[in-house]
Amino acid sequence: MKRGIFDLKEPKTILVVEAHPDDAALFAGGTIALLAEDGHTIVNLCSTYGEKGTLDSSKTLEEMIETEKRESQNAADVLGTKEVIYLDVPDGELAAGVVLREHYTEIVRRVQPEIVLSFDPAIPYDPHPDHQAVGRTLYEACYTSHFPLYYPNQQTRGLKPHLVNWYYGWTSSTPNTFIDISTTLEKKIRAVEQYESQMQMMLQESMNRLDQSGFNIPTLNQLEWKAFVRLWVTRTAQQIGRHKKIPYAEAFHKIGYGVLDILPQLQEI
């Protein structure tokens, strides 16, 4: 153990849950790399393949699925992720509710994580319904996973109830945990670069929106996609860390379940 990220003093299992294959690298890649370097076991769940993330109408869903799977495995190798699991729900069709909660509860019971990383359950102003569905439903599943009468059929398949204590939500409007990723920034950039299909799409979409809105940013016009990735990742990490005087950071909202949510008050008794 090196740094004790998230106050972990010994190797643990960390579950990272994405809506789409590039989410974790973009929002938490530096932190995931730190955790892997510290000896923790990282398991990554892709809720969808992100197969609709293209502006090229000549592409098929099957082609995009194969591309996204390859890119996600490559990114996992860069970050040090041990296992990548695919939930196999169609892109854009994740629906918050009982069905998705049962899927997530099953994964939590199978993986038995100490900590879960994903979207903030109270994610604000995110236009993608998949992001909202993942954050809210996974947060609920981490609570129900230790109650045996929730989805008891899972126990007949050897999946025991499991207690999750801490949930760390990225893309939060109220972050309370900031991780210095200065030593893993380059690794995060390399991981994001593995998603060539998505980064090229993101750059093209950005240019289309600027052009349609009448804005002209010469520097952006001249960027090739890898330079765009480096600029986006670096500037975002700098902006997050600025108020905490951290050169490059990622931010999360740390949520404790049950009594852990009032731990500071209890420690004052």
At which residue positions do the language-model features occur?
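C-terminal accessory domains and tails appended to enzymatic cores
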Residues: 1-11, 147-160, 171-269
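Structural signal for conserved beta-strand scaffold positions within catalytic alpha/beta enzyme cores
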Residues: 16, 46, 86-88, 118, ...
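Histidine-centered active-site/metal-ligand motif
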Residues: 20, 128-131, 195
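Active-site catalytic microenvironments for nucleophilic, acid-base chemistry
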Residues: 34, 38, 140-145, 194
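Internal alpha/beta domain cores that form substrate/cofactor-binding pockets in large enzymes
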Residues: 43, 73-167
